[in-house]
Amino acid sequence: MEQILSMNGGSGEQSYANNSIGQSTCLSRSMPVLKQAVLDSCCTNLPETVTMADLGCSSGPNTFYAVSEITSIIYKRCCQLGRSAPEFRVFLNDLPGNDFNTVFQSLPAYQGKLREENGPGFGPLYVAGVPGSFYGRLFPLKTLHFVHSSSSLHWLSQVPPELTDKANPLINKWKIFISKTSPPAVISSYLTQFRKDFSLFLKLRSEEVAPEGRMVLTFRGRTTADPTSDESCLLWDYLGQAFQDLVAEGLVEEERLDTYNTPYYEPHPEEIQAEIEKEGSFTLDRLEVIALPWDSVNGGIKDDRATTAKRMAKAIRAVNESMFRSHFGEDILDPLFHRFIEIMAADTKEVEHVSLVISLIRKA
């Protein structure tokens, strides 16, 4: 997974930078939770250098969003209190395939904008890239004061091993993710993998975050207890139908479809709370649900379903293309998403896009 998954880089038509309106909207909606966590931390004595990490930073207009908010809030609050503002050290993390070149090409303009908005006394701000999986250690012990992550933790570290066991694999016939036709063992394997990964994530960050340090994490989730509901699975079902069409036309082998499984899971709030309590290193300060409308990919513009389907196809492709290409090859991508658009446009179902935002405090 670490060597395969990456958002589409650059700034072209299929890039993540140009097809991440939904993620940007979700990030914006999570800001009240982030701002409160930062303000609460300002009630204590801040260190001379505040160190923060953004995990799953990707590339594009969303990359510096949270960092800008955190640093500006701290600086303005220190000015209000008559304190000396700290220096800032920022780590931007993503998998090695991330387009870090685009990120750092945009850095000078971003730093200039921060100084313009906050005044000449702001900073300095030092930024470094940290390629690697957040399911492994990334930073020295007790060095982080803030950790932020958005639209990343729904990705698993791997496909559940029960689905890839060559001796006796579980078969999720005709599907690429959990669905109503999935055997119970397939659904259980996804939950087990999520629990393992999320617990590991908390354990690793507990080693890196200083006592009383904060984490604000936003990721896709669900409000219904049933993990096979349309709320979690509808778009994946559309993709599954599109793949089935390609199999029928001889463009994809049936075995290739049956051996592809998406390393992804949308947890319920109770599943999140249970793992936080079980791991024990963090206090859950807040947990909120963000529900975006079905057509949020349009950026607030009311469009017909066919236009929405085209935008949704681009958004999904920008995120999943690297994995589809690795397993199925380059040639199936255009016909796959052409069929996805047709399937989605012909349907009438509408579901909200649900994310969970949690604010955590490292126990002393």
From Swiss-Prot:
Assigned keywords, A-Z: Magnesium, Metal-binding, Methyltransferase, Transferase
EC number: 2.1.1.-
Cofactor, free-text remark: Binds 1 Mg(2+) ion per subunit.
Positions annotated to bind Mg(2+): 172, 258, 260-261
Superkingdom of origin: Eukaryota
Molecular function GO terms recorded: metal ion binding; S-adenosylmethionine-dependent methyltransferase activity
Cofactor: Mg(2+)
GO annotation, biological process: methylation
Top-level EC class as recorded in UniProt: transferase
UniProt-listed Pfam families: Methyltransf_7 (PF03492)
Residues annotated to bind S-adenosyl-L-homocysteine: 16, 57, 62, 94-95, 133-134
Involved in substrate discrimination, annotated site positions: 148, 220, 330
Family according to the record: Belongs to the methyltransferase superfamily. Type-7 methyltransferase family.
Protein name: Probable methyltransferase TCM_000168
